[in-house]
């Protein structure tokens, strides 16, 4: 049976050191993963691009790094202790537990968005294949608990944060005062979160330990809907700008009856991963959280988290627009979208299949590979010096002198390296090298003293300016994205 594209990407990721099972020599832990040399570099590049987009290039967003362990009262105030639950059902045949809502969503996707007429009685267990043999749903709280200090009792009970957002809300007043920020403005946060997922899986898509890239944007009530649409547009363009094909993205509007307890409206950016049973998976949610969080924390803490506009004399609790992205889900999306198989000429005059990751150069873990044509010392010296010179620009550079040059090209293609630089015997005479481009396989001769400039011009450090506010507030319109929603083009 032929492997799916997703299976091939997972195999490549494990084989080439993007992702390893955590604790593999001890049998591993279900859906826990370590990121190898290439994986951690790709993660860092994604985080860097997100931070540049959300903080560095904007005058209205600042950053924080909040604690994983917060006072338990934070989670009481936010509603997580009482409502951060999923409905859990158990198959009476195989005793496998699943989220009832996810089973219903998978059923609807297979049956043209039609929900099961008889509820869970129509749904087949994905583990054993038996239909309709389920227990009644029971709520399951997803927060992971821990205890601080030497005594484990109710007084020492704490939680590992299930989201980074609450750290932003409780720091709202400190950040606003210290940074002299005023609405509309945002606070961005990246870091680890933890959820006791009932059914983790689909490689790194759903795990109990994961990284988030979240931003809370505080606005004047009454302007929230315009800002919400602005951030839906902005976040969608971010994925497209980094190479994701628009036809593989869509927007999912949460039905009103399924909105989270804090949300006025939520739109997910989904990617077509090709999962078994459900093609689409959420990359990022953009929610209009209204004034729920700041009001809740004001009430429970006794601290006034409102904003007073001295110019107008108006005092209000800001509304919040939240773009919340999953880092590891974004990484998985970029890998799947970049994965391709085409043909390349071989030394025998024929063609071979080649695997290539067409990653945007800004995301590629390795920016260029330096390849001496042979292991002759005179070529090795030139190649090693060139690699060291390029690393001085803070680029990750690979040096590979093992195997035929075609095989070395293939090794770099399948990890997404944009450029391969070959040092050959002519280099000793003309002081030039051959640079091969990953996607087209076109080759160009470049003088040694021009190589750094050549690489810099091709790894995409230049960026396009983007609108900084909604059209209704004088901003430029976003270009048509081509991303689908239910009912047509977005």
From Swiss-Prot:
GO cellular component: cytoplasm
One Gene Ontology term from the biological process aspect of the record: glycyl-tRNA aminoacylation
Binding residues annotated for ATP, in chain numbering: 195-197, 205-210, 282-283, 326-329
Entries under InterPro entries matching the protein: aa-tRNA-synt_IIb (IPR002314), aa-tRNA-synth_II (IPR006195), aa-tRNA-synth_II/BPL/LPL (IPR045864), Anticodon-bd (IPR004154), Anticodon-bd_dom_sf (IPR036621), Gly-tRNA_synthase/POLG2 (IPR027031), Gly_tRNA_ligase_bac (IPR022961), GlyRS-like_core (IPR033731)
UniProt-annotated stretches for the region Disordered: 470-490
One MF term in the entry's GO annotations: glycine-tRNA ligase activity
List of residues binding substrate: 99, 163, 210-214, 322-326
Localization terms from the record: Cytoplasm
Keywords for this protein: Aminoacyl-tRNA synthetase, ATP-binding, Cytoplasm, Ligase, Nucleotide-binding, Protein biosynthesis
Nucleotide-binding keyword on record: yes
Enzyme Commission number(s) of this protein: 6.1.1.14
Transmembrane segments: none
The keyword Transcription is assigned to this record: no
Job of this protein: Catalyzes the attachment of glycine to tRNA(Gly).
Subunit organization: Homodimer.
The protein, known as: Glycine--tRNA ligase
Species assigned in the record: Bifidobacterium longum (strain NCC 2705)
Gene that this sequence comes from: glyQS
